[in-house]
From Swiss-Prot:
This is Potassium channel toxin alpha-KTx 1.18. Pfam families: Toxin_2. Disulfide bonds join 7-28, 13-33, 17-35. Keywords: Calcium-activated potassium channel impairing toxin, Disulfide bond, Ion channel impairing toxin, Neurotoxin, Potassium channel impairing toxin, Secreted, Toxin, Voltage-gated potassium channel impairing toxin. PROSITE patterns: SCORP_SHORT_TOXIN. InterPro entries: Scorpion_toxin-like_sf, Scorpion_toxinS_K_inh. Expressed by the venom gland. It comes from Rhopalurus junceus. The record marks 36 as: Aromatic residue of the functional dyad. The keyword Secreted applies. Blocks high conductance calcium-activated potassium channels. It comes from the Eukaryota. Gene3D superfamilies: Knottin, scorpion toxin-like (3.30.30.10).
């Protein structure tokens, strides 16, 4: 799932993904965070 959180590196997505989908598995893709529930 792609969330509307800007990023430059994947670790910036981990806490945002934790909030959004409940897991901290995420990557920065195309300047947005992609989370893996």
């Amino acid at each position: 799932i792609v969330i509307d959180v800007p990023c430059t590196v994947s670790k910036e997505c981990w806490s945002a993904c934790k909030k959004a989908v409940g897991t901290d598995r995420g990557k920065c893709m195309g300047k947005k965070c992609k989370c893996y529930p």
